[in-house]
Design a protein with these regions (language model features):
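Acidic helix-start/capping segments at beta-turn-to-alpha-helix junctions
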Residues: 51, 90-109, 145-146, 213
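Beta-lactamase-like hydrolase cores
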Residues: 22-63, 242
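Bacterial Sec-dependent N-terminal signal peptides
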Residues: 1-27
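Conserved catalytic neighborhood of penicillin-recognizing serine enzymes
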Residues: 101-139
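Mid-domain, small-residue-enriched loop/turn segments at the edges of structured enzyme/sensor domains
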Residues: 118, 139-201
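Active-site SXXK
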Residues: 54, 66-96, 268
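Short, well-structured active-site flanking segments
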Residues: 81-101, 148, 152, 203-207
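Structured C-terminal helix/loop/strand segments within mature extracytoplasmic catalytic/sensor domains
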Residues: 25-36, 143-144, 148, 191-223, ...
Length: 306
């Protein structure tokens, strides 16, 4: 029965994601999004999955985009899979010391525990890694689970192949080019988001836990959430490369699940890569795309009740 369910979900996703876009007002929405993408001064990948079968729209959906910290979402899935199996517990203690609280990287945990020498729960570690995108927390989790390969193997075991996870945060800081080895296609990331929320790859308890952790994300609020009404529920994970010495930004990403006023949801992944635009412009790409989808759905809902 489990074998049948997994393969039914995979078959359903193949049909869903290989379909042409059939959004309400699909032509106008695609035109709108393409006009937004044109201002990126770089490569943009977009995948949108609505709440009705065949409600899809993709732009560069099969392209390879560096994930940066978006890869902390599949890492969290892999950790929680092990929690569900009883190997880990959210209450178990993880020791922090100065050796695993590296300097010169984004780490709210290091700011909170500058001298190390403390034990924190896996819950606190995972929350900091996802909600606050803590880089040290990320690499501690990779060591806990057995390395990047273990996470990649788990994601591939779900039937999602177009995601590569080969380098830790510390390794990405060694050389600018290394970040490109951690990549995903927008379509694959949407497939993973779908399986997370609807595909029962985690227990209900673990799914709800991670969903709430992602809702509490504090990084880059001006991307997916930037133009949505205050209080809109968005479970998301950002990824950012910063800019190199030439002003090139390898990754300005945000992926997540947006809840509409009527309680329905749509899934969206936006990757902005190799852009020469400034940070405000790059962030606005995601904000304007998700707002266009939001307005499209709300207009459709309004017209259905005229």
């Amino acid at each position: 029965m489990i074998f049948f369910r997994v393969h039914f979900i995979n078959f359903f996703l193949i049909l869903w994601f290989s379909s042409s876009y059939v959004f309400p007002y699909g032509d106008s929405l695609r035109i709108k999004i393409e006009s937004i993408v044109n201002g990126a001064s770089g490569k943009v990948g977009v995948s949108i999955l609505g709440f009705e079968p065949y409600d899809t729209l993709t732009i560069n959906g099969s392209g390879k985009f560096p994930m940066q910290s978006v890869f902390k979402f599949p890492l969290a899935l892999a950790i929680l899979n092990q929690v569900d199996k009883g190997r880990f517990s959210l209450e178990q203690k993880i020791h922090l010391n100065k050796d695993n609280l590296l300097p010169e990287t984004w780490s709210p945990l290091r700011e909170k525990y500058p001298d190390g020498g403390v034990d924190i729960t896996l819950d606190e570690l995972l929350t900091a890694t996802v909600s606050q995108s803590d880089n040290n927390g990320c690499d501690i989790l990779f060591r806990l689970i057995g390395g990047t390969k273990k996470v990649e193997q788990y994601i591939h075991s779900l039937g999602i192949k177009d995601i590569a996870i080969v380098a830790t945060e510390a390794e990405m800081h060694i050389d600018w080019q290394i970040q490109y080895h951690n990549w995903s296609s927008p379509t694959a990331m949407n497939q993973l988001l779908y399986k997370f929320f609807y595909g029962k790859i985690l227990s209900q308890k673990s799914r709800d836990y991670l969903n709430q952790v992602m809702v509490k994300t504090t990084t880059s609020p001006d991307r997916l959430k930037g133009l949505l009404p205050k209080g809109t529920i968005v479970a998301h994970k950002t990824g950012s490369s910063g800019e190199n010495e030439n002003g090139l930004a390898a990754a300005t990403n945000d992926i997540g699940i947006v809840t509409l006023p009527d309680g329905k949801r749509f899934i969206i992944s936006v990757f902005v890569s190799d852009s020469m635009a400034d940070e405000k412009t790059r962030n606005k790409i995601s904000a304007e795309i998700v707002k266009a989808v939001w307005d499209n759905y709300n207009m459709s809902h309004f017209n259905n009740y005229k």
